[in-house]
From Swiss-Prot:
Compartment(s) where it occurs, according to its Swiss-Prot or TrEMBL record: Nucleus
Compositional bias of kind Pro residues: 594-616
Zinc finger (C3H1-type): 1185-1206
Residues recorded with modification N-acetylalanine: A2
Regions of compositional bias (Polar residues) in chain numbering: 266-279, 330-340, 647-671
Protein name, per record: Zinc finger C3H1 domain-containing protein
Gene that produces this protein: ZFC3H1
Biased composition (Low complexity): 33-44, 114-132, 183-192, 201-210, 574-583
Recorded coiled-coil stretches: 219-259, 358-389, 432-487, 847-909, 965-989
Bias type Gly residues, positions: 62-72
Modified residues (Phosphoserine): 15, 28, 34, 128, 251, 352, 383, 662, 714, 717, 719, 805, 809, 948-949, 953, 998, 1046, 1301, 1303-1304
Sequence ranges of Basic residues compositional bias: 430-440
Length: 1989
């Protein structure tokens, strides 16, 4: 602010910034102000504050007014525009100053004027021309528009005060521009902060208006106290300079005002506001304020205090007024006498004096225009006088047309009278001379006045400064910063500086920069608004005295002086303005002293009154003022439209801007000076302090309709002319403007031409921004333009005169008119071009600023969003930590509780054991040993006994110890609570390491325990991963509800409070010792080279595929290949999926029973009406009834089931149902639509019954219809029923099925089979309503379904296990709250259940599974120990087993489980116990094998079967189980693994036995036999011997050992020892002659040795011996058919069937007899007497399945293909054993294959065959229960694979790949099929596809080792080394204990040249989880050892 902004382009007279800011100010007005206005609706202070959406007219309004803070708006558009233009240039600073003193500078971006340079008020007035008339008019019009709105509050006062007063209510933020000062500030804000200003520190948000006070706060926030003081001093200096300038300006202005008494009269009224301010200030610093008048220092609110005019001042002003009135009268007289000439003369005087002045005054004028707006009030009353004067002037001008016309008057007249003729050359010269003289005179006057003012000001300021400096020194000496701040604020407040503009210019700058923020705030605090309003009459009050732009700045200062920091003394810079500002200021000063007259520029008495119209801003509040303005605008618009000459007058306005430019003072200096000046007035007028807004006595100003006349800037053609004159002499233009306003009022009816904002924004009006030289040049140009304008005006006057008086000739008028027209056009074009350019520049600068602001805002928004995101993340993290900490606290508390219990128990036990020890010493050492052994062996039982017996009287000592321990533990509890976080971190790290070391056994969802149905709560999958419990707690499931706390609050814990004895100490010790002993040594013996050798010997991909697929296809039944076109097969595969059912629908004989209604017996015997729902209904037979509807009411609107209302017939439907039996009766056909039939039925009924329809009941009508139907059909009773199915019948409307109607079906199906095709005719039935789930309750709530009820129930009946489980899972599945809370709630329930049922293994199993999700590994182990201690049960041991993760732990639990089972078996033996023993034994063996311990596995199994010890496991096994155990042993010897038949092929982890069927060893060749054959046979013999139960019959014994015998026979056969095999078979058949397995084995031996006759003889002999044995005959039939001897079967078939009948059956054929035996309905009825009764029901029931097989198998031999198909379909419809169904299907498929192969229409037959295969795969179950378990199932695809492989043999090889892929997609978990597909891809050399398929199978079947190995081998073949690492990692997660995988990875790493460290890490990981690699890496020794075995 130190230097004013350098003048902008000469055109605008403003720095581009300033222009932009001006424009911005306007924009700020428009945009920002609109925003701000909206914010501070009533804060229209300053134009900027004006709430109007777009008040561009006066920049001052925005920039100046608002900038003026206090007075700017009060001085209305003129002052505002002056301020705007003026402030744009150097007065941007003044504007800032104005803004500053009055209230505060709005942020720079929004300031329309340069913030930094605050010119003294005088300089302001000078430099900133008043807003153009049009601008002021526009503002006035805007105000008029918004007059009724709240922002009207921003009338002249609010304008003058800024938001401060009205608009500036503290609550409302001023427009962006800020408060009253916002205009300036906004302009400044738009500009870059003036350099002199130290970077104004923008406080975060725009200070509320109150920040006027807080402006200091702002400084304080951003600047140090020292800085504040320094800036404060600078401001004081600036204010002193401004005061001096003001004094000079005021003195000169007073003279000018005296010259214009009339104008002053009018101005006095209007400017009394401003003048009163100025006057008061002038009293204080009269000369200074006079100088201030020059610049119309709206901001220098110093005069605000003066605003309240004292009587003496008023007299003085009146005197001045009187002096001024003569001047104005004089000029008026001149105008009237000479018409335009008088005006020209006045203008000449004004132009010379006031043109210079007006140029200076243009600033003044513009600011005075604001005052003029106030004067509009005076205009109202004076308008009549002005009209009279105007008439006189017109007359005089007519008379003087011939005389020489003063250029000044002419210019002004021309401005107003656009028709005036061009002034002659002589007139121009005279005008110029007059102008020059007037200019010189004015300058002299100004100099004198300035000298006086400066002297006075200096004295006053010196005193003030001394006082301030003393005060400042005191303040600086204070040590307390707060006290310093308070004192400093007091000091500033005392000076009446608005805090927002604290003396610190930097602060002001910052305010300027933050117009919006600081502006708003300051204005809110601005109390000066009221003062400003009071001082509206004062010259200094900017808004009130629009004529005094200089005062405007000054007034605004004075006005806002209440704002301590805002009061600025007129800056000395004003002195630089004097030439320009003096004349103008003089006029202003004159107007200031005579408060009533607006301070017109020097000698414009008549026109000054016109300037008062500009004050409309002052009276903006009043509607009259607005109306007047509006009228004026109308007139101006009309004149603009109609008078082109007016445009030429626009050329003049620029001159005043030049004046303004000539004295631009550095913004900073100006602002500082103005601040200082203002501060003085404030000090003098304490009433203006911000604090309470003192009522302004001047508030009651005469209300005149304001006419906005922008002297300099008036853009309208008319206003421009006036503006030019006003520029030359501010008031000259006003006079003509006022006259125009009068005309406008008279022409109110004329259409309004809205003022153009462009002209308002014309920056050319502010020449103050120009340098001095250019300013002078500008003035000269202005004078020249004024002379021309005057000539033009004279001509126009002459035209007028000639038109009115005949003295003037038409020719002269025409010539002059033409010239005027041409000149006007040229001027118009030039002015338009200039204005548009200026507007363009302004808009560009505005755009630039807006873009910058947008970028800043975007950045701030981004930052805010980033902060929000960060905070949200922090919040979530904190919540997580909180939850985890809570959880750990609970765990610690539980641990402490447990440990306390253990401690007490152990102490008691210690006492007991001590006593026992003492007793034991007395016993012999042998006894002691025994006891020790007993303790070791039966520790747990002993402990349980101890536990059950209460502790006997513990001693006092132990009680004390317990108490001490308790205290210690409590202390520990507290410490633990503190260490929770650390513990958690440590545990998380440990868990992470453990995860890295040992992959999780199962990748299961974190926690999704399905609620088990109550009958099966043991199905839940066990989660073996106990290392991630902490995480699981938080991730449990998304659908957990906030759990109910009622039940839990009473005693919330997650572990049962069981008084259990110490866990088996001995067992734990044994376990530990065992683990340490068994831990293998680190494998470091082998070198990398050896490992690489082993890797090279490893199985290749081909070997792997061959190994895994051998045995899969060995016994596949091969069919005949059907050669069909490949394209068809491909298409067929698609159709096959769509249409699976080729057979026609089943016809039920019951479907015709509804026609019974047509029988006469229906009514006579049944006595039923035809409407009976039993017969007349719309029931859909394939649609379920709604069970809710059946048992109550169904409230589900979308229920898909049938309801009573759905199938009950209405009256119309009943008639339609009856008529549907003969549609032709009603004229319809079968093809008719429902609508047609319905309509026809209604017509028929209507026609039939007619009038009687309403007299008959429904049943009577129905009876008549029935008789009609019978007659039409020709039926005679009683034969009236219908056998044919109706083509149409009424059906109930089925609700549309929603998309998710089948979701429950899919959710419920847990099976892996998902068939790709959907049957075409499948009915979309909703989910079967099999089980009512807890969420399924619609209408009846089971009492136990509600949690509260369940809680009550379990408390009443605590031993009800199912209720406890149901409640626990209720809590677990709650949808509220967190998952961990739900889990804890469920655990709490189960813990309570265990307290009441601690011996219930079912509860323990559920509890352990849930507890494993939250407890640590140690905690879970401890709870498992507790479980098996309290509830030792097979299931609880299995749960324990699955929850352990390492080999040692699992092996230990398995060993204990075997001991437990053996102990139980000693007491009683049972099949289930025997199976459990076998399963536990084989699990342990499998665990050892899986972890690489084949030798130990073999030893375990061997010891279990034939140990020398008495108590071997085999003793407790049933014969069948013992036989399986021996088979497993032999299989292990031979293949180093257990039989795969026992286990689920898709899960290679150690698991439970799923299948106990016997099997044959999978030897393929002699080489496969590893063991010595004789030794192997000896083992078989041992096995048979061990499995033979002598108590059984021979046949039973053979059958029990049959699996062993069949394997012995197979071994003999493999070894090609056929004779031995045959001998064995025959010997066995002697005891079991009809054992089909043995018979088949013998036949196979004969066939292998090509003894077909003997083979046939075997079957024939067996059949002859057992003619009624259907099983034997079936096998015989199969044999004959396979031998292609089917034709030979018929006699045997007859013989076989005859065995069931007595003689007499001969007349019946075989099929009829079979139908009779199988109870198949047929055409012939066979008497029952012919059937033999020589077989009992049991035997016959055993035979029936084979009878069906024989019936189907032999059917093709005796009947057609169609009947054979029907026979197979009938057989499949009979409920039979699964194995029989499979045999029927295989026979059926073979039949279909043969049929298709031999058919001519292969395509159709193959389609039938394919559909049949699909049906078979779909209908045959693949889910089988695990032995002795009804809850656990496994998927057995063995039969499905046989069917698929058979189908493949019937399909061309080219289709195998697609077929296999399709079946794999249908059965994704079918491991056998997956391996077959991989084998096929390998055979086709599709390694890439093989790799992809294998990788897919690793996801579908994640626990199948074979697929992992093939996938890895494929990657190795394709060199995908990185993928190999990933596959190993994934595989070991699924199969963590698989030694084979670990070995492969180790060898792979070694082959890759892996580092030794990596290999050692692998080995150490293996050791950690208990995997042994020793045997796998020493395969030779393993082999020899196994052979030795």
């Amino acid at each position: 602010m130190a230097t004013a902004d350098t003048p902008a382009p000469a055109s605008s007279g403003l720095s581009p910034k300033e222009e932009g800011e001006l424009e911005d100010g306007e924009i700020s007005d428009d945009d920002n102000n609109s925003q701000i206005r909206s914010r501070s609706s009533s804060s229209s202070s300053g134009g900027g504050l004006l709430p109007y959406p777009r008040r561009r007219p006066p920049h001052s309004a925005r920039g100046g007014g608002s900038g003026g803070g206090g007075g700017s708006s009060s001085s209305s558009s003129s002052s505002q525009q002056q301020l705007r233009n003026f402030s744009r240039s150097r007065h941007a600073s003044e504007r800032g100053h104005l803004r500053g003193p009055s209230s505060y500078r709005p942020k720079e971006p929004f300031r329309s004027h340069p913030p930094s340079v605050r010119m003294p008020s005088s300089s302001l007035s000078e430099s900133s021309p008043r807003p153009s008339f049009w601008e002021r008019s526009h503002l006035a019009l805007d105000r008029f528009r918004f007059r009724g709105r709240p922002y009207r509050g921003g009338s002249r006062w609010s304008r003058g005060r800024g938001v401060g007063e009205r608009g500036g209510k503290p609550g409302c933020r001023p427009p962006l521009g800020g408060g009253a000062g916002s205009g300036f500030s906004s302009s400044q804000s738009w500009r870059e902060p003036s350099p002199p200003r130290k970077s104004s520190k923008s406080f975060g948000r725009s200070p509320s208006r109150k920040q006027n006070y807080s402006s200091k706060n702002e400084n304080c926030v951003e600047e140090t106290f020292e800085d504040l003081l320094l800036k404060y001093k600078q401001i004081q200096l600036e204010l002193e300079c401004i005061n001096k300038d003001e004094k000079l300006a005021l003195s000169s202005k007073e003279e000018n005002v005296q010259e214009d008494p009339k104008t002053l009269n009018f101005e006095d009224q209007t400017s009394t506001d401003n003048v009163s301010i100025t006057k008061d200030s002038s009293k204080e610093v009269a000369p200074e304020e006079k100088t201030q008048v020059k610049t119309f220092q709206a901001f220098e609110l110093k005069p605000l205090r003066q605003k309240l005019t004292l009587p003496g001042d008023k007299n003085r002003l009146k005197k001045v007024k009187d002096g001024a009135k003569p001047l104005s009268l004089k000029s008026d007289t001149t105008d009237s006498s000479q018409g335009l000439q008088d005006k020209e003369q006045n203008l000449t005087r004004r132009i010379s004096t006031s043109d210079i002045l007006s140029e200076k005054k243009l600033g003044e004028d513009e600011e005075e225009l604001s005052e003029l707006q106030l004067r509009l009030l005076a205009l109202q009353s004076a308008s009549k006088k002005w009209q009279q004067k105007e008439q006189q002037v017109m007359k005089e001008s007519k008379e003087k047309l011939t005389k020489t016309k003063t250029v000044q008057q002419k210019v002004k007249t021309s401005t107003k009278t656009h028709s005036a003729k061009k002034v002659s050359t002589t007139a121009k010269q005279a005008l110029r001379k007059q102008q020059t003289k007037a200019w010189k005179k004015l300058q002299q006057q100004k100099e004198q006045e300035r000298q006086k003012e400066e002297d006075q000001r200096k004295q006053a300021e010196e005193e003030e400064r001394r006082k301030r400096e003393e005060e400042i020194r005191k303040i600086r000496d204070l040590s307390n910063q707060e006290e310093q701040y308070n004192r400093f604020m007091k000091l500033v407040g005392g000076k009446r500086r608005s805090r927002s503009k604290s003396s610190d210019p930097d602060l002001r700058r910052s305010l300027d920069k933050q117009p919006t923020d600081s502006g708003g705030g300051i204005y809110q605090y601005d109390n000066y608004e009221e003062v400003a309003m009071d001082t509206d009459s004062e010259t200094s009050s900017p808004a009130p005295s629009p004529v005094q732009p200089p005062f405007f700045s000054e007034c605004s200062l004075g006005y806002f002086s209440p704002a301590p920091s805002l009061s600025l003394p007129p800056p000395p810079q004003v002195s630089s303005l004097p030439p320009l500002s003096q004349p103008y200021v003089e006029g202003l000063c004159v107007s200031l002293e005579p408060l009533p007259p607006l301070p017109p520029l020097p000698p414009l008495p008549p026109e000054d009154p016109e300037q008062p119209p500009k004050p409309p801003f002052a009276d903006e509040e009043e509607e009259e003022e607005m109306l007047l303005r509006e009228e004026l605008l109308k007139s101006l618009a009309n004149k603009r439209a109609f008078k082109p000459e007016e445009t030429s007058s626009n050329s003049d306005p620029p001159s005043p801007p030049v004046l303004n430019n000539s004295h631009p003072v550095p913004r900073s200096n100006l602002s500082i000076v103005s601040i200082n000046t203002v501060s003085q007035p404030r000090i003098q007028n304490p009433k203006f302090h911000r604090g309470p807004r003192l009522p302004r006595t001047v508030i009651s100003l005469p209300k005149h309709k304001s006419v906005v006349v922008t002297l300099n800037d008036s853009d309208d053609s008319e206003s421009d002319g006036e503006a030019s004159k006003s520029t030359n002499s501010v008031f000259g233009g006003l006079e003509s403007m006022i006259k125009e306003a009068r005309r406008t009022a008279e022409q109110a009816s004329k259409p309004k031409v809205p003022p153009k904002s462009e002209k308002e924004n014309d920056p050319l009006r502010t020449p103050e921004a120009l340098p001095e030289e250019k300013k002078i040049e500008y003035r000269l140009l202005k004078e020249e333009i004024a002379n021309r304008e005057k000539q033009r005006l004279i001509k126009s006057d002459q035209l007028k005169t000639s038109s009115s008086s005949p003295a003037n000739s038409d020719v002269e008028i025409d010539g002059i008119g033409r010239i005027a027209m041409v000149t006007k056009q040229v001027t118009d074009a030039e002015s338009k071009l200039k204005k548009h350019r200026i507007l363009l520049m302004k808009d560009e600068s505005v755009l630039k600023n807006l873009v910058q602001q947008e970028a800043k805002k975007k950045e701030s928004v981004r930052n805010a969003e980033a902060k929000i995101t960060k905070l949200t993340e922090q919040l979530q993290a904190t919540e997580k930590i909180l939850n985890v900490n809570r959880m750990f606290l609970k765990k610690l508390q539980e641990q402490i509780h447990r440990v306390q219990q253990r401690v007490t128990i152990k102490k008691a036990l210690t006492l007991k054991y001590g006593e026992e020890l003492a007793r034991a010493k007395a016993v012999a050492s042998k006894e002691i040993g025994k006891r020790k052994l007993e303790q070791d062996r039966f520790g747990p039982n002993k402990m349980m006994r101890l536990d059950s017996s209460p502790v006997s009287s513990p001693r006092k000592h132990s009680a004390e110890l317990i108490a001490m321990e308790k205290r210690r533990l409590q202390k520990l509890e507290y410490e633990y609570a503190l260490k929770i976080q650390k513990l958690k971190e440590a545990r998380a790290l440990k868990a992470k390491e453990q995860q890295n070391i040992s992959p999780v056994v199962e990748e299961e969802p974190e926690f999704s325990l399905p609620q088990p149905s109550l009958h099966d709560l043991t199905q839940d999958k066990l989660t073996l991963d106990t290392e991630e419990n902490d995480v699981d707690d938080e991730i449990l499931s998304g659908s957990s509800r906030e759990r109910r706390r009622s039940f839990l609050e009473s005693n919330y814990f997650t572990k049962p409070n069981l008084k259990h004895t110490d866990t088996a100490n001995k067992e734990c010790i044994n376990k530990l010792n065992k683990n340490t002993v068994e831990k293998p040594e680190l494998f470091l013996g082998l070198k990398i080279g050896e490992l690489q050798k082993l890797y090279s010997k490893a199985d290749s991909l081909k070997q792997l595929i061959l190994k895994t697929t051998t045995g899969i296809t060995e016994k596949v039944l091969h069919g005949q290949e059907i050669s069909v076109d490949v394209d068809f097969v491909t298409a067929q595969s698609k159709t096959m999926e769509v249409k699976p059912c080729p057979f026609r629908p089943y016809h039920s004989p019951l479907l015709v029973f509804k026609s019974y209604r047509f029988s006469p017996y229906y009514r006579t015997k049944e006595k039923l009406p035809l409407s009976s729902v039993s017969y007349s209904n719309m029931i859909e037979p394939d649609q379920c009834f709604c069970r809710f509807d059946l048992t109550g009411t169904c409230n589900d609107d979308d229920c898909q089931w049938q309801h009573i209302q759905d199938y009950t017939l209405s009256r119309k439907q009943l008639f339609q149902d009856i008529l549907s039996y003969n549609l032709s009766l009603i004229g319809c056909a079968e093809t008719s639509t429902n609508e047609e039939i319905t309509a026809s039925a209604e017509k028929y009924v209507e026609k039939l019954f007619g009038v009687n329809k309403d007299r008959m009941s429904m049943d009577q009508m129905a009876v008549l219809l029935v008789s009609n139907i019978n007659e039409s059909k020709g039926h005679t009773p009683p034969f009236t029923t219908y056998k044919d199915k109706r083509k149409w019948k009424p059906k109930f409307w089925r609700k549309p099925i929603s998309d998710n109607s089948f979701s429950s079906d899919e959710e419920q199906s847990t099976g892996p089979i998902k068939y790709a095709f959907q049957p075409e005719n499948q009915i979309n039935v909703p989910a079967l309503d099999t089980v009512v789930t807890p969420d399924d309750v619609r209408y009846f709530t089971n009492e136990t379904d509600d949690i509260a009820n369940l809680e009550a129930s379990v408390l009443e009946n605590p031993s009800h296990v199912q209720l406890w489980l149901k409640l626990a899972y209720k809590y677990l599945n709650q949808n509220e709250g967190e998952c961990s809370e739900s889990l804890d709630s469920a655990l709490n329930v189960l813990a309570r259940a265990l307290e009441n049922n601690k011996d219930n293994p079912e509860i323990w199993c559920h509890y352990l599974r849930l507890f494993s999700k939250r407890g640590t590994k140690d905690e879970v182990q401890e709870m498992c120990e507790t479980a098996v201690e309290y509830a030792p049960d097979y299931q609880s041991f299995w749960t324990f087993l699955h929850l352990e993760s390492t080999f040692e732990e699992k092996d230990y639990v398995c060993e204990r489980m075997l001991e437990f089972l053996m102990g139980a078996a000693k007491q009683e033996t049972s099949n289930i116990l025997s199976f459990q023993l076998l399963e536990a034994l084989l699990f342990r063996v499998q665990l050892h094998i899986f972890t690489g311990r084949c030798q130990s596995a073999l030893a375990i199994l061997q010891n279990a079967l034939k140990s020398a010890n008495d108590g071997i496991v085999a003793e407790y096994l049933k014969t069948s189980d013992r036989c399986l155990a021996w088979l497993a042993y032999i299989h292990l010897i031979e293949f180093n693994i257990l039989p795969s038949k026992f286990y689920d092929p898709s899960n290679d982890n150690p698991s439970r036995i799923v299948n106990t069927e016997s099997f044959v060893m999978p030897w393929q060749a002699v080489q496969d036999v590893k063991t010595n054959p004789d030794m192997l046979l000896a083992v078989f013999e041992d096995a048979v011997k061990a499995c033979t139960d002598e108590s059984l019959a021979v046949e039973e014994r053979i059958e029990a050992c049959l699996p062993l015998y069949t394997n012995m026979i197979a071994l003999h056969q493999l070894l090609e020892r056929y004779e031995a095999a045959m001998e064995l078979c025959k010997s066995l058949l002697e005891s079991c002659p009809i054992n089909c397995q043995l018979l088949e084995a013998l036949v196979a031996l004969y066939l292998q040795t090509n003894q077909h006759d003997k083979a046939r003889a075997v079957w024939l002999t067996a059949f002859e011996k057992n003619p009624q044995n259907a099983e034997v005959f079936y096998h015989m039939c199969k044999f004959f058919i396979l031998q292609n001897r089917g034709d030979n079967l018929l006699p045997f078939l007859r013989k076989f069937i005859a065995s069931f009948f007595k003689p007499g059956f001969e007349k019946y054929n075989n099929l009829d007899l079979f139908r009779y035996l199988l109870n198949i309905p047929g055409p012939i009825d066979i008497p029952s007497r012919l059937c033999k009764g020589n077989f009992d029901d049991d035997m016959f029931n055993h035979q029936v399945p084979y009878l069906w097989l024989i019936y189907c198998l032999c059917h093709p031999l005796q009947s057609s293909i169609k009947e054979t198909v029907e026979a197979y379909e009938a057989a499949l419809g009979v409920a039979m054993r699964c194995d029989i169904v499979q045999k029927i299907w295989m026979d059926y498929l073979v039949f279909a294959n043969n049929r298709a192969a031999g058919s001519r229409n292969k395509v159709q037959e193959f389609k039938f065959f394919t559909d049949l295969v699909n049906r078979c795969l779909v209908t045959v179950p693949a889910r089988y229960p695990i032995p002795f378990s009804s809850a656990d199932y496994w998927s057995n695809y063995e039969f499905h694979n046989r069917v698929i492989f058979f189908y493949l043999s019937c399909v061309p090889k080219t289709q195998h790949s697609k077929t296999l892929e399709r079946f794999c997609s249908v059965m994704p978990a079918n491991s056998g099929l997956a391996l077959r597909l991989l084998q096929h891809e390998w055979e086709e050399s599709n390694v890439q596809i093989l790799k992809l398929q294998a990788k897919m199978f690793t996801y579908n079947i994640p626990t199948c080792l074979a697929t992992w190995k093939i996938a890895i081998a494929a990657e190795i073949v394709l060199k995908g080394q990185r993928e190999v690492h990933r596959l190993y990692q994934r595989a070991l997660q699924k199969l963590p204990l698989c030694a084979s995988l670990w070995k492969d990875q180790l060898l792979f790493e070694a082959s890759e040249g892996g580092k030794t460290d990596n290999l050692r890490k692998l080995v150490s990981k293996c050791q950690e989880i208990g995997v042994s690699l020793n045997e796998l890496l020493n395969l030779n020794s393993n082999k020899t050892e196994s052979k030795n075995h």
